[in-house]
């Protein structure tokens, strides 16, 4: 845990540990603020990226804030390990009881982190299976903004795009703009 430390001190500690033959794969650095509870404005989650970049080690987060949101955010920023204190009773005496989680909160934290991990995906932007069924409904078609008569020139004044798909894709807009209509079209009819 790196609470109450600056980057120079953290690098010195890592150097000492690795000089003692501790394999780097067994060394985890946890970004931390040692205030109980830590004010949100002092969390500085962006330091996780600095630790990863500068130390080239597995980096996590030791959370002393109230609630679970900051731990979940840390995971979304690349924290590979989360440490959060657990208590059976928040009313017990001790410096960290208020910022510790009870059983229900801890279960919520784990569920939230697992959901965030699932949401990371593959790094490739593609149409997912869950959204394929909405392609027809959510995509648009080129349609007549008003009645268009055969021979009339397509323009910004008489064409628009609307849901659903099934007609010409808006990607073809420039191909039709300023060309003559080959058919009559009623207002909101898909152009073909």
Predicted region positions:
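Catalytic cores and adjacent flexible loops of soluble metabolic enzymes
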Residues: 2-192
